[in-house]
Amino acid sequence: MAETENTLILETTQGPVSIEMRPDLAPGHVARIKELVREGFYDGIVFHRVIDGFMAQTGCPQGTGTGGSGKKLKAEFNKEPHVRGTTSMARAASPDSGDSQFFICFEDASFLNNQYTVWGKVSSGMENVDKIKRGEPVQNPDKIVKARMALDDAA
């Protein structure tokens, strides 16, 4: 798949992961994630919660699952299913509590459908996602070394 203005590249300790972001599904979430990427927010952030057969979660600056960027996002629930490779926003009990934390599904997770904001899907590098160390919490966790928007490199 060709890189676009909505291609997010995560350089992880397990290798690169490309995500095609979907502003048609979640314009507010995509815009905010792009802002955070361009600020370097995700650089060095660990995958703090990784459940085998379910998902890998990242985006907490404390590495514990309790932190965020400080800006809550209004839910943008959509009809896109949670399947292998889906990227979706983590949140607390309130639907409008998503912030900077997100997860990548290892497998189908239809029980999350219409309850979490899907904002993209892995387009390449899913084999690297599969290698991320599991745990709750993860011991010596894998991390995002650098997050970048693909076309920013060409500018």
Regions found by a protein language model. Give the residues of each.
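Cyclophilin-like peptidyl-prolyl cis-trans isomerases
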Residues: 1-155
